[in-house]
Regions:
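Scaffold/interface architecture of coatomer-like assemblies
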Residues: 24-299
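Bacterial N-terminal signal peptides
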Residues: 8-20
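N-terminal secretory signal peptides that target proteins for export/translocation
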Residues: 1-4
Length: 299
């Protein structure tokens, strides 16, 4: 009789454990990231699945549930340095941008692109549209402004605020910069916070020899250029000459149009994670991710 009672008790305990596990699975929240998976040469890698990615929340591994092509439309703000220091790069910028915006706006996915100048003060040349003709009008307005400096940090903040007002679901900033003086009077955390809060992927390409300025504005800008791409799943490229810009923009457009949507399991919790990261599960692959807007953790 004693053995029978022990057996029944063991069955009851096992059933309770299974029921609890089932309830926990039922309560699991699905969260997602837009992820770039690239070779060492920067080319997108096709046909990846859940086993190819490792997602962590505050260094705790989470189960990857699903991996699929990201087909949601992007809202892409191209911030162009039109300061006096960008004068020698402007011709290459004007030449490289048409193919970039064509790739982003061609096809079934209706990505919207805006052209925004950040020399002198942030100015919208072409608002968000998938019309290549309208975007070309904005590109044609790109010229350096005599006597002006760069207002990158102001431009990032204002663009992030604009994404919020528009309810952008997949916002992206691509900044094309000279190494001229930064004139925004901003702290780096004032810039990073709206990027994180808005789930904005920030990519930046700088052209020219690195600046040796020790001004406070230069230090704050350098911190943003260092931290923002890593914090938001973007990329940072440093070109000594703007002649290479066309190839880099082609590579970036290829990356943006071949991202994955990675869905993972987040356990029920009253406290959102401070940091969400994604990595490749095998060598030779680089993975970068941007947390999808409806999620509350920080990428």
């Amino acid at each position: 009789m004693t053995n029978r009672r022990l057996f029944v008790a063991a069955l009851a305990l096992a059933a309770a454990v299974l029921a609890g596990a089932g309830a926990l699975r039922a309560q699991t929240i699905q969260r997602g990231l837009y992820v770039s998976a690239l070779t060492d040469a920067g080319a997108p890698i096709p046909d990846l699945g859940p086993a190819d990615f490792v997602v962590r929340e505050d260094n705790m591994a989470r189960e990857v549930l699903k991996v699929e092509p990201a087909i949601e439309a992007m809202q892409i703000a191209v911030l162009v340095d039109t300061s006096q220091a960008a004068r020698d790069q402007i011709a290459h910028v004007r030449t490289a941008l048409p193919a970039f915006v064509k790739t982003l706006t061609t096809g079934e996915v209706r990505n919207e692109v805006a052209i925004i100048a950040i020399g002198e003060r942030p100015t919208v040349f072409t608002n968000y549209t998938f019309s290549q003709a309208e975007l070309q009008k904005g590109i044609d307005r790109i010229w350096s402004v005599q006597g002006s400096g760069t207002y990158l940090l102001d431009g990032i903040i204002e663009t992030s605020q604009g994404f919020k007002k528009r309810g952008a679901g997949r916002p992206v900033i691509v900044a094309l910069l000279s190494e001229g003086p930064e004139l925004s009077n901003r702290q780096h955390d004032q810039v990073l916070e709206p990027l994180r809060a808005g789930h904005v992927a920030f990519h930046v390409i700088t052209m020219g020899h690195p600046s040796s300025s020790l001004s406070e504005e230069a230090r704050e800008r350098n911190r943003v250029l260092d931290e923002a791409p890593r914090a938001t799943g973007g990329r940072r490229e440093e070109l000594l000459t703007s002649m290479a810009l066309g190839a880099k923009l082609t590579q970036l457009a290829d990356e943006l149009t071949h991202q994955y949507k990675v869905t993972y399991a987040h356990p029920p919790s009253l406290i959102p994670p401070e940091r969400v990261t994604v990595a490749a599960a095998r060598p030779g692959v680089t993975a970068r991710g941007t947390l999808i807007k409806e999620d509350k953790g920080r990428p």
